[in-house]
Amino acid sequence: MTLRDATPADAAALARLETACFPGDAWSEASLSSHLSAPLCPACLMEDGGEVIGYASGRALPPEAEVYRVAVLPRARRRGIGLSLMGALELRFAGHGCDRFFLEVRASNAPARHLYETLGYEAVGVRRRYYRAPEEDAALYEKILGEEA
């Protein structure tokens, strides 16, 4: 497996990954291309045999950063890929001068919540009815560098 930075040239592959991971809420190829072209929007992806099997992206707004997306193909989960992607994304955020990270996750997504908690994120709130298809609350998480458990 290979971990590398994502570029706008990866937008089509990431759109396919989005569709597999987030049916009904997937980012389009055009949205991904725009995001990957924007300044201070790092993204990392994991490839296995040339196939993109996971990615993480966000936006740095120093001194803070927001994790936008973390996606791993269902058949590739529970192999440490999410952990590797999040670690790489956090390093890129830190390189932009960020030391406080935020994210939202579906309240029912126990595996993702466990991943974020393992990485030192703390639940700090709830956004009611944040998600659609299906409608669901978002759990808000925060991590401050130097304060990890």
Spans of features found by a protein language model:
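Glycine-rich, flexible loop/turn motifs
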Residues: 23, 126-127
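Conserved glycine-rich acetyl-CoA-binding loop
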Residues: 51, 73-87, 94-96, 100-101, ...
